[in-house]
From Swiss-Prot:
SUPFAM superfamilies: Ribosomal protein L36. Keywords: Ribonucleoprotein, Ribosomal protein. This is Large ribosomal subunit protein bL36. PANTHER family: 50S RIBOSOMAL PROTEIN L36, CHLOROPLASTIC, LARGE RIBOSOMAL SUBUNIT PROTEIN BL36C. The gene is rpmJ.
Length: 37
């Protein structure tokens, strides 16, 4: 899980979602997981 000031999708399987008011990227590839904060 990477924490970044701005999250971006890396591949076409990455999805941007909102969880508990936080913007996150979820993907099949665990290296692509990101959280904004």
């Amino acid at each position: 899980m990477k924490v970044k000031p701005s999250v971006k999708t890396i591949c076409e399987k990455c999805k941007i979602i909102k969880r508990k008011g936080r913007v996150m990227v979820i993907c099949e590839n665990p290296k692509h997981k990101q959280k904004q904060g």
